[in-house]
């Protein structure tokens, strides 16, 4: 069927900010879809609230709205644009839920807007647990024994009938949000209550647990003519019971017989056909390892995280094909862009093994509950490709960037046998490394399989890796064992450890003996047809399929897996850098390990290498390609951390040179640079042991800010107020040594602001100055940022411009740099300089109209700012006000304290733009799901040092008609100052205490600040935890609460008697 001509304009809904369970894969999918629709001649309108996306660039759609993804705002855009159709299936769970909501309001019918891709009935059948259960019964597809509940009492009754364990699955939620495995009544009460609260339709499925079965996924496509195919099948390393987003996953499935594969394939195709889905769909199934019995677990009637993985694993562009199916094209009418010959109806075939490994945030959140279950906790993932399971697994391990380069963790050898058993039975994020340790201690595959329910086949692969290690240890400096180990994915670094040599010694020996990787093409057809797409992975085999180009090329290093502190913003910068390289006449080569991102879409660069970002793997690509140079400054700290080793290997680093990178990152050199150009910074010093730390803190005075050097996202950064806390920090938070010094600075409580600057070595362009709403002490990534600044005097602005220029010139910056300032008593201090692109680049690019990463790349390649049409100094400011607001995923991470501080905790961001600060703030709060009504009840629980400041705030809320509740100390203070307050009991004082009030549903917001006192801290953490669980807007910074008050005041009318 030819494409539809009765529709001309299509609105695409994006997925909004990055949260756990919904990350960069939707930027990749949305970008592909918008470009595919434009390619077919449709007018595309995009709405998304996330500025850190390629999808929201002006070139991707005909009109782009970066507005809150709420029914209110999307309805306004629908009325303004009057599209013929709406495509919600590329916006994740957010897109689906929004489509449902818009349909319920009647606006789609009113405006005659058709829903494309997947009909509402299909969304309902897949997402509504009751309808899904009925459909599976009608299809005679087995599902676990289950019941739909709308109350905790119903859940308890059903569990008493079928027995524990049971799994709770809330309807219409993302990444298993609110769900979990329950083994008793107490757990079931708790998880069901949360699940019902988080489900937009107040519905949960309680099902008999089948934890321990194999978990298999099928990524399927279907068109309007009922043509359907399986793009990819995947098998989880972990059994059912651990969310697939938190599991290691292999593609294709490794342990299925042909009969089992056909059984599950047929079931998946039957389901997509019954749902009449037009586009992509993900089917998750559980297979009994001891029989042919299987169960259907879940169906996602949309493009998902697994779709992105399947696309990158096979090369089949699922989102692009899904978008074209939505406008009427059929699978047998579309050419597969990888081969350029076969049709999209042709099922991909793989002659390699893909491993996906999740990246967890527990290096940031040491207090978090690391146990894995049905609720997702990973922030990102890596993918690796090899010819064997062992090779792809070991490549994935060293892609994670968690300080390991093999499937082992050295510290685990110190764990006693009893603890090791517990770590194996109760799965955590690091179970893979405990499995390796258990095998080293002589545990058998059968024993481990019994304990973990992991298939013996996978455990045998781990044992094989161990056998290769032993062989290497016995036969040092021999060619055959080295070659054998490289074929199975061993890194030079691991071999160096086993041979007691340096990594460079192993590399030299390897090259001397002709042991080099070859690069194979990802072609969707197992080399049956010639492929046109230069998308490669390394392996140690015969025949290299990647030939170095005769044209001049530049290698750009990506930023690896998404984690807190280094997110999608860096991928945005990478993609823009590639565009500029190509525009300058060079071939652009990307190297990255993240399957979720736009940068690893094979159509973005001239060549894509899907490889770990380690010195060894990068040098292997450089040896083959011989690029003119390597660009590091868009790959976040991942790429910057490789600079020194690449420089030592005489690799040309383009942009700011390594010696100047070191002058910005090394504390003593940086202090000298600031001193030389007469720029003030907080008093501070580098220390290498506990005694030095105490001496420095005593000299500069408490409070102090302590942090390790060379980190991103403020990892392990703390404000310390007393000597005892400083010692605790030095002993537990960091590994301190002369190689890994700790920085101790005087903590200045002032107005924080930051600048992204672009320099050609002569002139310095400052696109704009961002002013933080929260005072210094809250990490810049967790602060709300306003552009243009609203409260900085002209003198302060001029000083910031002056200091930025001086720093850029002194540090010989070529390209981008980010500088953070704090202003106190009219003095501007420099807190930090990052000699690279920062996470604010997409935001500032969008609000100023300057394609910052492209401009910086052109400067790196030799252009000047003047040649590009830019002047030295501050760029003209925007007529609108723009607010960037952070997004957190605390509801997925139990036991993580949501109190904001110097260590970054946010996973994503949104933007609010309008003609005034109040309107922009309102949009930013709405986009970040911080909806506070015009009146209601608000709780204040405030530390002593903040009571005076909070009084003015409480009076403001009271004047608007809010009823003020406060814990005893705060209440007494408010009453002394004539503010009417309802006193509530602290935790444990009486039965009707603060937590019960919060669970009652009568509270509209909680304002909580904390002291460093241990008892207060525990109570405060519990209050914050309950607020997050109950979905109550929580403010832990008075500055953020003041911003919300300002919004509410701007929307209220004054009411006065005569």
UniProtKB/Swiss-Prot annotation:
Pathway: Amino-acid biosynthesis; L-arginine biosynthesis; carbamoyl phosphate from bicarbonate: step 1/1; Pyrimidine metabolism; UMP biosynthesis via de novo pathway; (S)-dihydroorotate from bicarbonate: step 1/3. It catalyses: hydrogencarbonate + L-glutamine + 2 ATP + H2O = carbamoyl phosphate + L-glutamate + 2 ADP + phosphate + 2 H(+). Gene3D superfamilies: 3.40.50.20, ATP-grasp fold, A domain, ATP-grasp fold, B domain, Carbamoyl-phosphate synthetase, large subunit oligomerisation domain, Methylglyoxal synthase-like domain. Mn(2+) 3 binds at residues 820, 832. Mg(2+) 3 binds at residues 820, 832. The keyword Manganese applies. GO terms for molecular function: ATP binding; carbamoyl-phosphate synthase (ammonia) activity; carbamoyl-phosphate synthase (glutamine-hydrolyzing) activity; metal ion binding. ATP 2 binds at residues 707, 746, 748, 752, 777-780, 820, 832. It holds the Pfam family CPSase_L_D3. Mn(2+) 1 binds at residues 284, 298. Residues 133-327, 671-861 form the ATP-grasp domain. Residues 930-1058 are annotated as: Allosteric domain. ATP 1 binds at residues 129, 169, 175-176, 208, 210, 215, 241-243, 284, 298. Keywords: Amino-acid biosynthesis, Arginine biosynthesis, ATP-binding, Ligase, Magnesium, Manganese, Metal-binding, Nucleotide-binding, Pyrimidine biosynthesis, Repeat. Mg(2+) 2 binds at residues 298, 300. Belongs to the CarB family. Composed of two chains; the small (or glutamine) chain promotes the hydrolysis of glutamine to ammonia, which is used by the large (or ammonia) chain to synthesize carbamoyl phosphate. Tetramer of heterodimers (alpha,beta)4. Large subunit of the glutamine-dependent carbamoyl phosphate synthetase (CPSase). CPSase catalyzes the formation of carbamoyl phosphate from the ammonia moiety of glutamine, carbonate, and phosphate donated by ATP, constituting the first step of 2 biosynthetic pathways, one leading to arginine and/or urea and the other to pyrimidine nucleotides. This is Carbamoyl phosphate synthase large chain.
